[in-house]
Amino acid sequence: MGAPKHETGGRPGRAVVWSWCLYDWANSAFTTLVVTFIYSAYFTAAFAEDPGRGTALWSRGIMVSALAIAALAPIAGALADRGGRRRYLILCSLLCVAATAALTFVRPDQPNAVVIALSVFVVANVAFELGLVFYNAFLASLAPPERIGRISGYGWGLGYFGGLGALAVALVVFVPETPLFGIPTGEGFNLRATNLLVAGWFLLFSIPAFLYLRDESGTGRGVDVGQAFRDLAATVRHLRRYRQVVRFLVARLLYNDGLVTIFAFGGIYAVGTFGFSFAELVTFGIVLNVGAGLGALAFGFVDDRIGGKATIGLSVAALSVATLVGALAPTRTWFWVSAILVGIFIGPNQSASRSLMARFVPAKHESEFFGFFAFSGKVTSFLGPALLGVLSDVYSQRIGVGSLLVFFVLGGLILWRVDEREGIAAAGRA
């Protein structure tokens, strides 16, 4: 296939932009089915003697993944800026697809099943997250700063709806007591086979991105790991040039911890405090994802109008209110109010965070800076769950959920000091 057409001014055409957005649709099957809903629940129930032990084991897999991503993402980004990020995007995507498919064939009754399953999952999860480093790095080249917000929003919105689409297929075809197409249910094979759905979905819908995305001229300087480390060290030494990036990443480190914890424990809180049934829990998940998808799509245009910083600030304020309402909610009705607020503003928060980072990254260093972006999202991601867990155990789930306000408030205060115009100018994107 020839090079994709570009619009006036050298910007990629619509086919390139939409192929980039479609990758969000593709990869969301992994986070929705494997990490959040189906395989994680299957693992905790089938690979341990009780759900509590299973949850502890699964959390270790998540923690190991997060530490590996935090360690690898910055250097992987620097390496990709030298060698061309497209090849690394394809490599990480295919590795995630292969490892996810392999999870299907790890049975809970085989020797060392827990170690094997968690090891394969960690490989898949790390490959997935590193792929996002290279994927996100393309955003800065897709549009000028004043249009980046809506494109990031398109991607996040499609991602949420893609995850829902894959979940719907899984619930109809694989999960019923009598799955369609004669899929066997022995030893939970039908549940493990949802990993094949994820692998196929991810691979199929990633193909346009693999075909249309191209590295900018000046990349492809050759794979030199030693030079990549030196480039990374030089960037760290000169971070004073990019002080707005540093402030933003510290702010994101905090408010993202609150966000991640809401996603991880929202369902647990709904069941433990408000007695949600499985059907109500599925409805809760759908509401969050639909709200997040619509919010990301709508607020992409708001982002381009008022700026990424203001959009993030608005979302952090709304999430703070939602957290407080959820912690104090006297009835299910008030809990649903908080859930809808969370759903509407989670998507814009994630989308605007990505678009603001894209405005702040200097040319030829996109992957490296998005490596730092991934680092800030993972290096302290255990703090929110740890604080909520301890306070829930000592006091109550309501106190635990309420404690997440600390992350949103501190993150919002640091974000308030970020100068968006200065950050864009320092990156040479004004």
Model-predicted regions and their roles:
Residues 2-18, 214-250:
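Juxtamembrane intracellular "pre-TM" segments in multi-pass secondary transporters
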Residues 32-55, 264-281:
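Short amphipathic helix-loop junctions that connect adjacent transmembrane helices
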Residues 52, 174-200, 390-408:
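A membrane-interface helix-boundary motif in multi-pass transporters
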Residues 71-84, 294-308, 392:
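Helix-to-loop junctions at the C-terminal end of transmembrane segments
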Residues 87-102, 310-325:
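Structural signature of the two symmetry-related core transmembrane helices
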Residues 104, 201-212, 403-430:
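Multi-pass alpha-helical transporter architecture, strongest
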Residues 104-119, 327-339:
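Helix-loop junctions at membrane interfaces in 12-TM secondary transporters
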Residues 130-143, 348-361:
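Intracellular juxtamembrane helix-capping segments at the cytosolic ends
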